[in-house]
Amino acid sequence: MDIGLRIFVVFVLLVAVTAEVYIVTMEGDPIISYKGGENGFEATAVESDEKIDTSSELVTVYARHLERKHDMILGMLFEEGSYKKLYSYKHLINGFAAHVSPEQAETLRRAPGVRSVDKDWKVRRLTTHTPEFLGLPTDVWPTGGGFDRAGEDIVIGFVDSGIYPHHPSFASHHRLPYGPLPHYKGKCEEDPHTKKSFCNRKIVGAQHFAEAAKAAGAFNPDIDYASPMDGDGHGSHTAAIAAGNNGIPLRMHGYEFGKASGMAPRARIAVYKALYRLFGGFVADVVAAIDQAVHDGVDILSLSVGPNSPPTTTKTTFLNPFDATLLGAVKAGVFVAQAAGNGGPFPKTLVSYSPWITTVAAAIDDRRYKNHLTLGNGKMLAGMGLSPPTRPHRLYTLVSANDVLLDSSVSKYNPSDCQRPEVFNKKLVEGNILLCGYSFNFVVGTASIKKVVATAKHLGAAGFVLVVENVSPGTKFDPVPSAIPGILITDVSKSMDLIDYYNASTSRDWTGRVKSFKAEGSIGDGLAPVLHKSAPQVALFSARGPNTKDFSFQDADLLKPDILAPGYLIWAAWCPNGTDEPNYVGEGFALISGTSMAAPHIAGIAALVKQKHPQWSPAAIKSALMTTSTVIDRAGRLLQAQQYSDTEAVTLVKATPFDYGSGHVNPSAALDPGLIFDAGYEDYLGFLCTTPGISAHEIRNYTNTACNYDMKHPSNFNAPSIAVSHLVGTQTVTRKVTNVAEVEETYTITARMQPSIAIEVNPPAMTLRPGATRTFSVTMTVRSVSGVYSFGEVKLKGSRGHKVRIPVVALGHRR
């Protein structure tokens, strides 16, 4: 190789190493907001809450024009081969994603016509019985024609890890075939191996987006699949929660754990894969997926995804390519549900911030999988387990994993985890109950209960016990289905009782080797769930408010999360090759937790509301869900939230709107809310333009809109909640409600607040005809400065039975 060629190769390698993905937004409106003005191109803008007519010649021509402009600026600035354009964004934002060097990114930043240049950043996943818990089969589905029609003709788009199309939760109906779906125009990719489409009548769209992942060197086609195939499990699970078929038998290991159903079992599924097994995803791919989903005509977007960290160039949480794209989606009439994040129970851990998004927190529902271990001394130890019992009226010998090793030298494998059957003496284990240790390896995923089950079965054990000897804050113990008797003892004191009994009953020689095993026990039946009334509760991991307006963590005048939905131990479809949860590798269903599971609950319920009220805006649907939610649990008490005590033990405390938003979703009430707090694109711009610290220049960069909208204070944004982060003296905020009932109704308005802040409403009552809109005001005055937020609510009680409630949060300051 001559010296010149060698230098060239080194130069190319350096460019490849230093190049990164950047998202560039341009001057000029995207399709959704272009009102004309460029020579030869007629307007394509839609009114607020209207879908884009992608079949229109005007849209097609303008889309080509935008893409040519993207190509032109790259071609003018850089030599061919020194960059790669990954996507053109045309529908919701005007811009593109490109793989360029930092120097080229700086050149773009200074180029005429460029609004912003953001370095791409990563996103992550935010990881049955709940239809009954939410009252869907008896109170909601019948209003839409039963489960056979629940969600009919509504398309839910999932930006996630793909789908396993062969699962029965996603099968086409033959008894009641689906009809045509003229408003949806998405396409279906083929499986590159089988050449079969990923779609059927249930799955109506399936595409994948991985250009940014490939450019970053993160994509592995062997495990990530260059297709909509789910290589993780997460995407199949979330799709089934929202829109999986009804009545699918949930069978594992020869046992049935009930029947699975989505919230809207007749809704159609559109798949936009942008998340992957090992690395999560990249915003450039996610934005492309959202842009395509709205272009295709989805009605609802379910996002169980959130940013790892903000882009370095972003000053505010509300303005970046991701949130700006979602603002465009909402302008096009698409309802967006996004997971709140799993950073709880600590404050300001949300990863979903903007007023146009419905941010969903996770609740624990009324189901627990409890079990017990009965010892030979008569003591009964509580634990958890999804397993059958040992034979009745019989005790089995207990043998510790460390006492039945073939060779003590295998201790380097951490044998007490019971992950490797070959290190144990089968003769000593067979017919007995194997005692294993629940170490930190289970927490980080290098050990799994599934492997404990496999080890115990291979050795012929009568069952197994997992003992927790110490626990750190945040350790999550979830029951895992087992084909053999098994139990997890999560209480450290109970574990010590078992260990003490075992040691006292076991005879050893002077070297410590066991001479005889005399400890005995039996495992109870853990297959059936135990229902309780202290539900719902806010899950420990669910991210908490207050919401933040910038990455200095200054509080925003907007309440988040918005609403609470089930997100703990949720049964739903899984893909056999999914690895997101090691306990469910190779399984068809999984029982997992996260705000990732809560968001599709709201997406599915929003589909039911959309089905009944097809003309409602995303804000109207959000309002209906929030104002009819409940802050009372099944026992009639105020909602509680899991929290850490001073000793770092998990305890329950009184929950606040920073935990649950407006409250726990009540689907049947959301179908008939009485009043709605509506908002549109101009209202969202008004919120941005009046939020302190956000410059008009930055707003124009991401929305191509001047700040001609002034609502005086961001707290005046017409949200179904009120948040004032800096209340000094007296402040009045206004809200506007619309009667969506079919009859005239008179509402009495009342308000209450914690003592440090006085609250008044005006007028105290108002009458609204069907379709009429009225305004009321809420005045708050600081009585005393406590340094903590005060919580309250405004209630509107209708003469015909409607009850509307919005939460109020305010932080008083001295003048």
From Swiss-Prot:
GO terms for cellular component: membrane. One of its GO terms (molecular function) is serine-type peptidase activity. Keywords: Glycoprotein, Hydrolase, Protease, Serine protease, Signal. Residues 21-124 form the Inhibitor I9 domain. Glycans are attached at N503, N577, N701. Residues 120-671 form the Peptidase S8 domain. GO terms for biological process: proteolysis. Coiled coil: none annotated. Pfam families: fn3_5, Inhibitor_I9, PA, Peptidase_S8. Induction: By methyl jasmonate. PROSITE patterns: SUBTILASE, SUBTILASE_ASP, SUBTILASE_SER. Residues 1-19 form the signal peptide. The active site is at D160, H234, S596. Expressed in roots, leaves and flowers of mature plants. Its EC number is 3.4.21.-. Residues 397-501 form the PA domain. Belongs to the peptidase S8 family. PANTHER family: PROPROTEIN CONVERTASE SUBTILISIN/KEXIN (PTHR10795). This is Subtilisin-like protease SBT2.5. The gene is SBT2.5.
